[in-house]
């Protein structure tokens, strides 16, 4: 029997990049300039809670932020050290996820409120953390590191 190796669906569409500042996150970068923030180092223990925190200025939950229109009106501006969320594991450990890049926060994954373990069990799709854009005409930004190897699927024939 011979096997075949294929790039995952995510890796066929997005390029996987590391963060220059934080080793716990990775970016799935689309050629259109949209970037999905995902976990790079998956915790061993079950994730039991995700806290999207509050902004200092408005005191609002980031996951309830409403963005509208082509200009992304209402989106939050992120700095590399902006905290996106904190998640807690069953073993008592707590992990902070920061943006790592300068950009505009378009969406937080509010599904993580009801099913927080998606961060661990499906990090590249249902368990993504945030979606970031960079403004008109900007396709890449500082803070993204080297390309990471794509995930491969192995099928037996």
From Swiss-Prot:
Q: One GO molecular function term?
A: actin filament binding
Q: One GO cellular component term, please give it.
A: lamellipodium
Q: Which InterPro entries match?
A: Abitram, Single_hybrid_motif
Q: Which GO terms describe its biological process?
A: dendrite morphogenesis; regulation of actin filament polymerization; regulation of filopodium assembly
Q: State the Gene3D superfamilies in the record.
A: 2.40.50.100
Name recorded for this polypeptide: Uncharacterized protein F54F2.7
Whose protein is this, by species? Caenorhabditis elegans
